[in-house]
Amino acid sequence: MANIKSQEKRIRTNERARLRNQATKSSLRTAIRGLREAIAEGDKEKAGELLVSTSRKLDKAVTKGVIHKNQAANKKSALALALNKL
């Protein structure tokens, strides 16, 4: 347990940030899962719309510092490649 006041505050701050990041990552995974399901079904129109919204969510996660920009670029590239194979 922290003995210093600033450490106690950092613990509280870090916990809030952890929960916020967890929620962002969860919504990202949900969006990616939905896109992959649309690709698996062969629904090109729906998958195209979902790719745009998923890419936007990935970019926002990078801006918030939740994921690294290279990870987002890698995921966007892989998802676009999968969509283009339809």
Swiss-Prot record:
Region (Disordered): 1-25
Basic and acidic residues bias: start-end ranges: 1-18
Highest taxon above the source species: Bacteria
GO process terms (BP): translation
Gene Ontology CC entries for this record: cytosol; small ribosomal subunit
InterPro entries: Ribosomal_bS20, Ribosomal_bS20_sf
Keyword set, alphabetical order: Ribonucleoprotein, Ribosomal protein, RNA-binding, rRNA-binding
Protein's UniProt keywords contain Transcription: no
UniProt key word Mitochondrion: no
Role description: Binds directly to 16S ribosomal RNA.
Protein family (similarity comment): Belongs to the bacterial ribosomal protein bS20 family.
PANTHER family cross-referenced by the UniProt entry: 30S RIBOSOMAL PROTEIN S20, SMALL RIBOSOMAL SUBUNIT PROTEIN BS20C
Protein name stated in the entry: Small ribosomal subunit protein bS20
